[in-house]
């Protein structure tokens, strides 16, 4: 078998190991999916890098959100964009999710780390993230409040 590089080789030769992509960037997900990844993880920093790399895709939407969300803070707008990107990019993993009956094919998105001491805020945001797509997975800080959440 001819491999598409080391990532693909690892996915084929070690099927017991699930390989995840540490990005929700469109090109990165396409690259990884062709080479056997079964999930992707993200957080606000990763999404920020995705936006920088894909500004041509997201710039118009950001401007629209600023107009639509007149009373929102920059942070609120940023989180709405994070949710949109997460929901959109989770669709790329949906075929893996469906083929594996939900055991693989998830996009993991982290709650806002500033809530690491607020169980209720983390739960509220986790419920929102979970509602974005059937294959969303939520990351919560391993703080005392996070464990309780």
Could you tell me what each predicted segment is?
Residues 31-43:
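Catalytic domains of carbohydrate-active enzymes, especially glycoside hydrolases
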Residues 14-17, 35-36, 132:
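Structured helix-beta-strand junction loops
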Residues 37, 46-49, 54-147:
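Active-site beta->alpha loop and helix N-cap motifs at the rims of alpha/beta catalytic domains
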Residues 1-27, 31:
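N- or domain-start disorder-to-order transition segments that initiate the globular core
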């Amino acid at each position: 078998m001819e491999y598409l590089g080391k990532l693909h080789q690892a996915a084929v030769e070690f099927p017991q190991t699930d390989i995840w992509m540490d990005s929700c960037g469109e090109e990165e997900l396409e690259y990884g999916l062709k080479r056997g990844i079964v999930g992707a993880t993200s957080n606000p920093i990763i999404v920020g890098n995705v936006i920088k790399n894909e500004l041509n895709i997201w710039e118009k939407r950001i401007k629209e959100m600023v107009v639509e969300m007149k009373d929102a803070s920059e942070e609120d707008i940023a989180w709405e964009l994070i949710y949109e990107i997460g929901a959109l990019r989770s669709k790329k993993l949906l075929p893996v999710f469906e083929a594996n009956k939900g055991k693989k094919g998830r996009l993991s998105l982290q709650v806002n780390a500033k809530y690491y001491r607020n169980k209720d805020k983390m739960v509220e945001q986790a419920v929102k993230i979970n509602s974005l797509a059937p294959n969303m997975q939520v990351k919560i800080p391993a703080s005392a409040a996070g464990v309780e959440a």
